């Protein structure tokens, strides 16, 4: 995969750490994508650090280290378990063992089918419709959106 990191800062505190993959010609083995695909992941740097989804492991480490600048991750937010969003959850969870995994109840139930993460039960922070996670000045408000794409989707 030739994935290209874009050094994109959305704001001083919100950084894009995704990558473009121009070598993929079919998304989910079904949809033609002649220009490739973007894997989207973001970091919010506040009193607490949150990583929103993960991308392909060949790019996650470099992209994440680039913006963390020595800080550690407090929260790994898992919007859903589709591989282009979640492929690197285990690697990130292992690298940041203190990080809580923020996810829906459905995603928590599904997660062990995809990944073997140490101390999973105590690391999960299950959020539901209307919950808020305070990072400092930034607050994440959760909306459950099951079957918008996958059964456990939250935004």
Identify the role of each PLM range.
Residues 7-66, 155:
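Conserved beta-strand hairpin/beta-sheet module of binuclear metal-dependent hydrolase folds
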Residues 50-53, 74-78, 142:
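Short catalytic-loop micro-motif centered on adjacent basic/acidic residues
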Residues 47-48, 73, 97-98, 120-122, ...:
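Short coil/turn connectors at secondary-structure junctions
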Residues 57-102:
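Active-site metal-binding motif and surrounding structural segment of the metallo-beta-lactamase
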């Amino acid at each position: 995969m030739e994935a290209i990191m874009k050094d994109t800062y959305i704001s001083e505190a919100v950084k894009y750490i995704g990558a473009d993959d121009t070598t993929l010609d079919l998304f989910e083995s079904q949809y033609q994508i002649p220009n490739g695909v973007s894997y989207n992941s973001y970091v919010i740097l506040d009193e607490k650090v949150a990583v929103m989804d993960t991308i392909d492991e060949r790019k996650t480490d470099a992209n994440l280290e680039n913006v963390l600048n020595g800080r550690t991750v407090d929260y790994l937010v898992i919007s859903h378990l589709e591989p282009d969003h979640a492929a690197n959850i285990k690697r990130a969870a292992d690298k940041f063992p203190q990080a809580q995994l923020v996810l829906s109840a459905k995603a928590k139930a599904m997660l062990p089918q995809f990944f073997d993460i140490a101390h999973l039960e105590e690391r999960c922070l299950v959020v539901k419709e209307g919950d808020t996670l305070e990072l400092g000045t930034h607050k994440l408000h959760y909306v459950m959106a099951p079957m918008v794409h996958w059964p456990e989707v939250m935004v």
